[in-house]
């Protein structure tokens, strides 16, 4: 998506956000700031439903009168409404506002007129109790009036599905901040999503008739929306079917509402914890795009995850389990389990999955599983300050089960940490954007698959590509023993073998591409001639030290320059002191 289109979406978001904050002003007092979202999120969904259905409202009422005595009426009413949902109530926001004395009963009548799938969305918000509180505080009519105003209009002729999706996400962000939650946990900005979509689709077969896309931690489902939008920009005839799972009730409700409005199958949006309550067992997908939580523990899911891991290949987590404090690698394993034989996945991670965990540990075993199956295609390091809730460096992992021949057995690393434009105004900790030009550089680097090539200007915006053999990330961790000695310096023996001195025990990481014995003879024996390897303790490990691969030596400042700078500083200080004491005298 070009920047001017993103800017237009931003303007729509800003306009609607201003209206919504006016509603927040009305709630001040009866509702605490962290409760504003309990009112505004479901009201925004209701108003979006209303404005989408308004043009066909009378047609639905007429159809309902004809078919209401039939046992199955959904199909008729959905056809009349033009959507996967409908409302058979005679009320609209306009007629609700015309009768303020009966606003509660009429509004409840209006809500009860929605189809079952829309009712399910509203149930996730616990909206009935919120309505009761608005009635008790005399704010229900005021809130409906504000949403019913011209500036509260959310119809699809003015607000596209993508626009509305980002309005929802902006609201979630604002109210998560006021609640003290992880503010960006449900929000991935469009610049990052469009980079991910272009990486996924850069080698795609666009002559196909259909594609499936899955997001395992979908939030409000904007990654799915953007992926579908991008596919249709490339080929409008492709039938895109989206699937998603989400554990937060409010964001799930928004995602399901968005899917209903876009005409997709709302049953593909499923509620539950992805790690412990997989809603898509046995499913596989052609594309997976996701930004699961990182740095979050999985204690809540521990029992279910460990039980599934014990099932071996019948489950998703057989390759290994990460440390309990960070479950992001579990989402990677979930994605790989659901990736079709020719599928491709883009998933956001922090730095931990690159190197955390020693040889033989769960995190290392997961990396080994990915690399030895040749599924890791590319890792792109983004700049810091790209997300609203964290300023740390983040990485896009691209995994493929159908690498082209020239990429087989290899992994591409792209350092795009210098490929950004500073924002004029930050959003939380998001101070940097991936512009069209930045995205083009990164996608070009990915497509060309060059080793040691810089794209852009190293004095400005650029990214750098390097290509490695997959085996280069592996190593054998060997245990080096040395013997105990008595006071006379003689080696202590037990059953004719030297007794190891645990205080002198050491380890060495020997690259998989090197012979262990040759390495030992070259790197250890010259310095410890009495040492030996305990081969029973050798373990295979994998790590991806991305920072080391792109490190550039910076020569220290010359001693002469440092001395000259210190001399100038000393002279300045001396002059300042002399002037000070001269004035005091």
Please name every model-derived segment.
Residues 232, 260, 264, 293, ...:
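Hydrophobic alpha-helix feature that most strongly marks membrane-spanning transmembrane helices
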Residues 297, 301-325:
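Conserved catalytic motifs of ABC-family nucleotide-binding domains
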Residues 26, 35-45, 252, 321-399, ...:
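Conserved Class I SAM-dependent methyltransferase catalytic core
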Residues 1-204, 268-279, 381-384, 408-415, ...:
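Non-catalytic, mostly N-terminal accessory regions of nucleic-acid modification and defense proteins
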Residues 183-290, 294-306, 350-352, 359-366, ...:
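Conserved S-adenosyl-L-methionine
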Residues 225, 253, 290-292, 329-333, ...:
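Feature representing long, continuous alpha-helical segments
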Residues 388-482:
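Flexible, glycine-/basic-rich loop-and-beta segments that form/coincide
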Residues 284-285, 326-328, 342-350, 376-377, ...:
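Active-site lining segments that contact anionic ligands and/or coordinate catalytic metals
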